């Protein structure tokens, strides 16, 4: 898929920015201090007898410790502050999960079941610079906790998406460390909204491979130090230069590094763009993004699965 025509892209970004403008008020409450998780990782007050037994390694929500190729991940993307931010924010978290499960069902195969995921905007690029001048608003911890609880009820993953504005990807990731220590929480980087020197939405952002690698190694260390199952690590891309030096992106043990072909348009252009960005074969896991409102003729699941190579991750916005 070619990048959308300039006028369509501008209209889309204006709509997104109108929604992002509503989020400035979040910055006043984004510093809420709460604990991560809901206690599901086990009781720390074990008896001395229990402590002599090696604990069973924690698994993914639907079993096992490896995401790909054991599962195909189908995700909803968005945030609750506005439906313009994506499908995940429409209705309550549980309502979004029910719609996601219905959408994901056609992708499930006997040899490759579906693992649902909620891709929640944890950092939202903002047209308002905010008090720190970084043009991004951090999602309140109470919201992240609510979506994590909904994901766990559905045996799904939570994926925290970073739209950093003028902030640094690694710094924003470190802010999410308490969540990333959970076995069912992954991370996504959204370079379109990394725009140092410009207001988000007025230009298309990008990121260098070296910056992606800093984040990947940091998250991989969390996986290793906490003996976690494989963690989903997504980088969105819809222009060739959105990830500068892409060939140099590392794939540390413990991460399912996935390049998600982003961007809306008609089917021929989307398919062409997918082929362009997946020509390097099996080096990275592959993702494909669909837009309920912006795509011209939403592709059906059987058409998505017919892509070559078939995507490991399918995201709906």
Where are these regions (language model features)?
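Active-site beta-loop-alpha junctions enriched in small/polar residues
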Residues: 79-81, 121-125, 163-165, 190-194, ...
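Structural preference for beta-strand elements that scaffold enzyme active sites
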Residues: 71-75, 113-119, 155-159, 184-188, ...
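Surface-exposed substrate-engagement region within the catalytic domains
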Residues: 203-316
